[in-house]
């Protein structure tokens, strides 16, 4: 069973024995238990198991008890802490001093004991010591015997916990590059300093020829391969599309296409094994290959040295990013096409926060209402009336993005793996056509997934960029997938590559300059690619970015919904500027 980090709950208390401490013991510990129950009943790990909380063995009133708590948390694999109290405590004696753990403090809003006073005092201590902490203070006063968690407090506790678990899950893992720089794309010039200092992730790299070596030497699970081919024959090959993109002289024969299917299935198994290892290989005598690279994310270069010669990685990328394969429903992997590691990191953020498979897309085209009318003779309507952005790429878009899963209200959605059903799986596969690759671009052949995302799904488009002299910055745009007139779609889609998956996206507009219209969102995007996650997760992304000291340069989240460490308030009243100043002052966590 996979091991996950845990969240440590620290119940702090007034250390004065002889009446004061004794009167607060039950109340304080009950608050800690309530927080643990809130988190474990609402948040899940990647395999669907509840996020586990560890509570200190006793309340914490003096520094020796803080040390004992820290020791226990180290043993238990804690990756973040939440301190809770209903009273005054001794700030620097009871605070969490671990340099790498994200920290939050909930000070109970009650009149009998000054929990809010401790909250303010300990947050001042965190600021003074350079250990940022999130402050949580309920809007309304509660009675002393009320151990319920108000909705506003619960929202912040869960937002903190989601982001903190993402930080903890990344630490100590690897990003695996298959190959190197793809077609001069800057995002695939992997920066090891960024990964190490900001994420706690090491960089691993294998030449793409390692995939061929394992194929030729039979270093893969042959039983799984047979199972995978049977599954592919049942669910994918029947949906093979017409080879209409290739000129007759460039079309592969039926035998060559069948060989491509076999090749890309083996390729998928081998790429997964390289990422996370496979105990079956140990049984086969391949001890080194069985280990894998401990990769939480990866990227495949593909173009051009591979795709000019061998079947492309589209099938492998799409399927690994999906919440299922021939082994059934499982957690989606994170695999960036073209080894765009910057986009791979954004995909990883989205996956860790949402639990869903991620889309990898070119932010390809802004279609204004006027341009659509000119080329189609028809008008965009409904949510698309102000213009649309075409998200499309040959490779690593999860098949979950078909929108063929449905929520309880019957609406199209993308689900985390623990909510997926066999009916969802079959619907996603049925909606996906596998077209032979365009051999003008992919000379080695292969197959590209094609589908049209259902409209009406809330999604968040995001991107991490590296800027010389500044460092990493994150941008995001919350919005929706949209349905457009099928005749409009047909015309627009045929103007690009109709063998690839398409998603029509509209951002939520507001009065911020980058979001005044749909064109401005496209015009302010920082790179050619974007990662798209199901759900409006902008608030969570902003919280996560602050933990990692990555400023957010563009977003359409309302200011009153932004949750960052309390010390960010000391860097000025404008939230964007204070974020940049705070991130610059504190610097990356692991430097």
UniProtKB/Swiss-Prot annotation:
Cofactor(s) for this UniProt protein: Mn(2+)
Main location group: cytoplasm
BP-aspect Gene Ontology terms: D-arabinose catabolic process; L-fucose catabolic process
Chain sites annotated for binding Mn(2+): 338, 362, 529
Gene3D superfamilies attached to this UniProt entry: 3.40.50.1070, L-fucose Isomerase, Chain A, domain 2 (3.40.275.10), L-fucose/L-arabinose isomerase, C-terminal (3.20.14.10)
Enzyme nomenclature, EC number: 5.3.1.25
Record Pfam families: Fucose_iso_C, Fucose_iso_N1, Fucose_iso_N2
Pathway(s) annotated for this protein in UniProt: Carbohydrate degradation; L-fucose degradation; L-lactaldehyde and glycerone phosphate from L-fucose: step 1/3
Active site: 338, 362
Known role: Converts the aldose L-fucose into the corresponding ketose L-fuculose.
Assigned protein family: Belongs to the L-fucose isomerase family.
Protein's name according to its UniProt entry: L-fucose isomerase
Source species: Phocaeicola vulgatus (strain ATCC 8482 / DSM 1447 / JCM 5826 / CCUG 4940 / NBRC 14291 / NCTC 11154) (Bacteroides vulgatus)
Source organism phylogeny: Bacteria, Pseudomonadati, Bacteroidota, Bacteroidia, Bacteroidales
